[in-house]
Amino acid sequence: MGKNVVVLGTQWGDEGKGKIVDLLTEQAAAVVRYQGGHNAGHTLVIDGEKTVLHLIPSGILREGVQCLIGNGVVLAPDALLREITKLEEKGVPVRERLRISPSCPLILSYHVALDQAREKARGEAKIGTTGRGIGPAYEDKVARRGLRVGDLFHRERFAAKLGELLDYHNFVLQHYYKEPAIDFQKTLDEAMEYAELLKPMMADVAATLHDLRKHGKDIMFEGAQGSLLDIDHGTYPYVTSSNTTAGGTATGSGFGPLYLDYVLGITKAYTTRVGSGPFPTELFDDVGAYLAKRGHEFGATTGRARRCGWFDAVILRRAIEINSISGLCLTKLDVLDGLDVVRLCVGYRNADGDVLEAPTDADSYIGLQPVYEEMPGWSESTVGAKTLEELPANARAYIKRVEELVGAPIDIISTGPDRNETIILRHPFA
């Protein structure tokens, strides 16, 4: 009997999911992306060689692992084809192992133009999107006007829908944002070129998953971004446009929730965030700079510097509840090496002095101050440790306190970027 495991982020993204998915896929028959788009950036380091993936599931570097892109992913054909080419140049076979749902909404040039025009118009109040068209593509999907991958293979139907879409979006671009219109013929010609290249990779992803399940195969579902960026459960409106939480697994792949056996939540030993939005434990001092430098905190997709702060047990407790987390993976523990004192946020205090749990919208964070516990740090290195006993006593105490504060076990500890620099206390597929 196979096991079906979800791996997702429990903070604001960038928790180190790519490495863990790559590590665990040694046992998986297939890896599935079920939401998001090429706004994700999953970094893998294998024997010192770094690979960044945006759309292709992180199992692609494991020989024989099937990689699936489910219907919940918004797909930019140009970005996907560039990613395939880069991997193939490294000798990684992709096309025969990658399968894409024809129900994936397409991201085309007008989505990118709209995304960037909106952020430009917002000025200082911008959301902090990647500018890659993710939000506008999801809007078209929900408005039931979007083009999907399957439409690419019906030229006349595609052209008719594209014409209607460009009439609508070009009106907004030209008359509201004062930006140039997107050319119909150029967009159509590019799309038809994509169609020829994508057609061999089309498949009914839901049917593929259920066939694997019936044959007792292990399946991994790879989340993108983080739980606090979820369109419904995140710090709205500073969120992404998809469901980044465990519920998105079913809707974004066609694999029912009762088939899932284990949900692994990835969390950093501290907290980071890219772009705008509330961040109660954010640091603006030397410690924040230390975390950013030691943790190489720059976005894999945009290159933007990440905001850094202390570990926040409040947001993690919320993420554990909404995802029904089975166990946690604590990443980047080694970044805390060398600090005299480490802090953990255990609650938020408002102006009345009351200690609160995590709010559900951005405005409710205004005026909240973090309540901290302090613990002694450690001077010894944790880099590359492969057993719990190899860790300094204070690091072990920190791990134990995190478990106590959030009410979930830490099953995996990452002690470096390479897939081998990991302590596995309980294997999700065991």
From Swiss-Prot:
Binding site for GTP: 13-19, 41-43, 306, 332-334, 414-416
UniProt-recorded Gene Ontology molecular function terms: adenylosuccinate synthase activity; GTP binding; magnesium ion binding
HAMAP family referenced in this protein's UniProt entry, alphabetically: Adenylosucc_synth
PANTHER family given in the database record: ADENYLOSUCCINATE SYNTHETASE (PTHR11846:SF0)
Pathway where this protein functions: Purine metabolism; AMP biosynthesis via de novo pathway; AMP from IMP: step 1/2
Localization annotation: Cytoplasm
Cofactor binding note from Swiss-Prot or TrEMBL: Binds 1 Mg(2+) ion per subunit.
EC number: 6.3.4.4
Family note: Belongs to the adenylosuccinate synthetase family.
Catalytic activity annotation: IMP + L-aspartate + GTP = N(6)-(1,2-dicarboxyethyl)-AMP + GDP + phosphate + 2 H(+)
Subunit structure: Homodimer.
Organism domain of life: Bacteria
GO cellular component terms given for this protein: cytoplasm
Reported function: Plays an important role in the de novo pathway of purine nucleotide biosynthesis. Catalyzes the first committed step in the biosynthesis of AMP from IMP.
A GO biological-process term: 'de novo' AMP biosynthetic process
Protein name, as recorded: Adenylosuccinate synthetase
Keywords linked to the UniProt accession: Cytoplasm, GTP-binding, Ligase, Magnesium, Metal-binding, Nucleotide-binding, Purine biosynthesis
Binding site for Mg(2+): D14, G41
A Pfam family this chain is assigned to: Adenylsucc_synt
Cofactor: Mg(2+)
Positions annotated to bind IMP: D14, E15, G16, K17, N39, A40, G41, H42, T130, R144, Q225, T240, R304
Gene this chain is encoded by: purA
Classification via CDD domains: AdSS
